[in-house]
A protein has these predicted regions:
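Class I S-adenosyl-L-methionine-dependent methyltransferase catalytic core
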Residues: 1-208
Length: 208
């Protein structure tokens, strides 16, 4: 009887872990599970929010995903950049300052055999510096710690450092209650609320 109870408890735990797993939700890697942190220090974008976001991109901004060079800021597990690669993006650069995050990124990239299509940078996303020899990026994700206006700082840093193509699409995930303080050179194209989270799609204002 004890063994049966233990087996049921183990099965229930396995089901709970499977339901809590973070997966790629579309494209060629659909259904693949990502390695995620054992603590709350890194907060991956939920599957539901990510699916909703990429549905918007697929319907309204498909040209910004397919063949894109992607910059994933505050990358954590890399869920957003890897989702973009799964859906046809050409290359993704992940910016992650923490040791844990970079370890998770390496594991996920290797699991998907994407070493030739990715780069991991150890640096502060709010102080990117000059892009250097890298090509500018077409699609930029920022999922920073909530409520600290770090996404806006990171976008400004990317602009000042030459990381953005003039028509790049920027995606910011933030707490729905957080105030937005964008540099005047950016404009919000669209925003969607998902519970306590808000997703904003942003571009540079047209010159002139």
């Amino acid at each position: 009887v004890v063994n049966l109870v233990e087996s049921r408890e183990a099965a229930s735990q396995a089901v709970a872990e499977l339901e809590a797993a973070v997966r790629i939700v579309g494209g060629k890697f659909r259904g693949r599970v990502l390695v995620t942190p054992s603590t709350n220090a890194i907060r991956p974008t939920t599957d539901r929010t990510r699916e909703s976001l990429f549905n918007i991109l697929a319907h309204n901004f498909l040209d910004k995903v397919e063949g894109a060079r992607v910059l994933d800021l505050f990358a954590g597990t890399g869920a957003l950049g890897l989702e973009a690669l799964s859906r046809g993006a050409r290359y993704a650069t992940f910016v992650e300052e923490s040791v844990e995050g970079r370890g998770l990124l390496r594991q996920n990239i290797e699991a998907f055999s994407l070493q030739g299509h990715t780069k991991i940078l150890r640096r502060d996303a709010c102080q990117l510096g000059i892009v250097g020899t890298m090509e500018p990026f077409d699609l930029v994700f920022a999922d920073p710690p909530y409520g600290r206006r770090m996404g806006e700082k990171a976008f400004l840093s990317a602009l000042q450092g030459g990381w953005l193509n003039p028509d790049a699409l920027l995606v910011l995930e933030e707490d729905a209650e957080a105030a937005l303080e964008l540099d005047e050179r950016f404009v919000v194209l669209e925003e969607r609320n998902y519970g306590g989270t808000i997703i904003r799609l942003i571009q540079l204002k047209a010159a002139g």
